[in-house]
């Protein structure tokens, strides 16, 4: 696999970019997660960043990437509505893994947004998308720009939802390379990695949560529900960060 030219790829239409990366992705599918990270660091341009929501299985990608690239900036987009357990989990993992945490937030406070727009998350898909644009997408775009990111690592997995089922290891999103080292991992592999390295699930895992985001759009799993149905009232799976 040869080095890739980000500027040249960004000039191509989306379909042509996918085709241009197809051969590389076929080779990346053969590598393990550590091999994918190492390949990206050797062949893709810096600066490098890792995003995390500090969700249920966040410790895996945080540990995996950080042990290969210590001090990599870890981007958290904080809506101000995370669970108290999530904020404690952030502190715990930041200390344990010595993370170089970079927290980004919306330019307007949560209180300002509610006063102006009401509770956007109660306003159907359109309201949820506007909420996500303000609190997730814009802060992430700002983070990528301020950190001069050209390669972005994330912990998405195909098993998590239908919208992620066909994602490749390597893509281009928001004008930068996006690498998904554990895209093909199943829940058993996640568990084994956590056990091997003395890591924990998010605290709410033990209370029946399969996925954790904001307090107002996250539901505890109940029999018959898919993981997707525990987020955004089942109307959406993605918060906007991993779309487009």
Swiss-Prot record:
Active site: 239
CDD domains found in the cross-reference section: PAPS_reductase
Pathway(s) it belongs to: Sulfur metabolism; hydrogen sulfide biosynthesis; sulfite from sulfate: step 3/3
Keyword annotations from UniProtKB, A to Z: Cytoplasm, Oxidoreductase
Gene3D superfamilies: HUPs
Alphabetical GO biological process terms: hydrogen sulfide biosynthetic process; sulfate assimilation, phosphoadenylyl sulfate reduction by phosphoadenylyl-sulfate reductase (thioredoxin)
GO molecular function: phosphoadenylyl-sulfate reductase (thioredoxin) activity
Compartments where located: Cytoplasm
Recorded catalytic activity of this chain's protein: [thioredoxin]-disulfide + sulfite + adenosine 3',5'-bisphosphate + 2 H(+) = [thioredoxin]-dithiol + 3'-phosphoadenylyl sulfate
Keyword Cytoplasm: yes
Enzyme class, UniProt record, top EC level: oxidoreductase
Pfam families on file: PAPS_reduct (PF01507)
Coiled-coil stretches: none
GO cellular component: cytoplasm
EC number: 1.8.4.8
NCBIfam families referenced in this protein's UniProt entry, alphabetically: cysH, PAPS_reductase, PRK02090.1
UniProt similarity note: Belongs to the PAPS reductase family. CysH subfamily.
Function: Catalyzes the formation of sulfite from phosphoadenosine 5'-phosphosulfate (PAPS) using thioredoxin as an electron donor.
Stated name of the protein: Phosphoadenosine 5'-phosphosulfate reductase
Naturally occurring in which organism (per UniProt): Shigella boydii serotype 18 (strain CDC 3083-94 / BS512)
UniProt gene name: cysH
